[in-house]
Amino acid sequence: MSRNSLWISTFVLLIFCSHIVETKGQRLPVPDILKATSEADSTYLPDFSFAGYHNGESAIPVSAGTRIHATDYGVVPNDGLDDSRALKMAIKAASTLDGKVTLQLPAGRIILSDILYVERSNFVIRGAGTGANGTELHCPRPLMYVKDPVELTELREYLIEFDKRQREKENNIDLPFSQYAWSGGFIWTKVPNTRVKSYLQKYDKPPTVLANIASGERGDFVIEASAIKDLNVGDIVELQLFNKEGKRGALMFGLYKDQVAKVGSHHWNFPDLPLVKQQVEILKIEGNTITINAPLTIAIKPSYKAQLVAWKHLEEVGIENFKVTFPKAPRVAHHVEQGFNAIYLTRVYNSWVKNVIIENADSGIITEEIANVTMRNIVTQGENHAHYTVMMQGTYNVLAEGIKVYNKAVHPLSFNTFATKSVYSNCEVFVDPILDQHSGANHQNLFDNIKVHVAPNSDRSYPLFAGGGAGYWKPSHGAFSTFWNIHVHFLDGLDSELPITLNGMKDGPLARLVGITANHNVQVFYEPSAYIASINQVLENVPSLYRYQLERRLK
């Protein structure tokens, strides 16, 4: 090749490469809803970036503090004998130590048949990993064979008093609900002698009120108090909003924007039960003006009788690096689960669960009354038909990311009662997926960058957005719940050019669905008054709304 020819070839190559760089360097447009400047309901998008450990602003710690070894208290892996007593002794010993403490579990199989209660802050249960040479907690029998937990006394009475039963005439089933259908776990965080969830009014006790709140705007961090008592900067407290005005109370409009025909009776039959709760840190107090660390989900009106109350909780609790296994067991019926539940998180704040595999569970992780928690890299698998995998119930600013669901479950990913401003991000469901929103005043939650594997129905539809929950807690969710960059991998139905319909939701007001794509054209139906955009368009520019909002906030 002549020098002149070589120069021409190089010049052409440089032009081609510069074109590629220029193309790749172009700023791709962001979805229109991210450009909206108005606070109008039609385009309002919550800021979900406050979800997770320390509002997503700090990495989960790796330092162990004082490390104690379970083997020093009698745990012997791989010997086929029960280790429950030894594990409880190790946790008791940890409770006597000051500062950060890590209970290190050995590699191998550890047998657990009783509940391990975690009742202190700054405590981590850590295994050796989830691989072949990691740690396995094997639970050979369900919680139904454990002594009835005193913490579930109120729930047990409620189930009996209200005759809560699973009735399936076609299957000859008429059985009482299990106390473990949505509660309890073999690893159980709790504040001693503290109620977690309200079921019966006779157990109600007046909270410690620290401030009465008169007003505040949606999305703001500043609230105005009418009275303040014993409230200090740095306090972690609970903001509560009530409906004391009956069936047509103003808070119903705040939650559902008058978009649904039927609102369940629990919204007005229990006027002393807060329908909206946020666990927040007090950043500043100037006179009657209070600044909190996260934005309000709903504008506060005087009729909501809003208040800040003391909130008992644990902090800096970690559960990580092990596998929990249960034996194969036949499924009896929905709500009649025996109690193969791995982890029950209650009343924890700025805490985490990470790198855990859960096999053959009825429910992998159940939550109640938790905030600013990250659940990361959790795998659920097995042959048993689960109720829940990693569920969100009574959550605020909770992040579940990297969840992989390989097993069949009634509610694979679920925002349940009182889940608020919480996020499933970068998750994948391989079997019968449903992005469940389970009623109970859950609102402003986000399904973010989710992949699901679907076998569509014979009519070329699939109820991906089906909402569960009891009628007395309907509708399925409040305004502004969001689906962002949802990718559907259809397993069949690809032999026709007709679009496949994704549906299932008829009582989910003002949802946001942006970037629903598949390996086949889809159409989306979601009611009522949903904002639907970028269907069949991959959101390469903003694949994760949570990450996009977090990065912008932390700039």
Describe the residue ranges of each PLM region.
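Bacterial N-terminal signal peptides that target proteins for export
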Residues: M1-S9
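Extracellular "leader-to-stem" segments immediately downstream of a signal peptide or signal-anchor
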Residues: N4, V21-P106, L112-V332, D507-K555
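Bacterial N-terminal signal peptides
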Residues: S9-S18
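Extracellular beta-strand solenoid repeats
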Residues: H69, Q104, I111, Y117, ...
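Glycine-rich beta-solenoid repeat tracts in large extracellular/virion proteins
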Residues: I115-E119, T135-K147, I160, S178-Q179, ...
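Right-handed parallel beta-helix
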Residues: N122, E315-F326, Y349-N360, A371-N384, ...
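Extracellular beta-rich repeat passengers
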Residues: P192, K202-P206, L210-I213, T367, ...
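Beta-propeller domains
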Residues: P274-V280, K284, I290-K305, V309-E320, ...
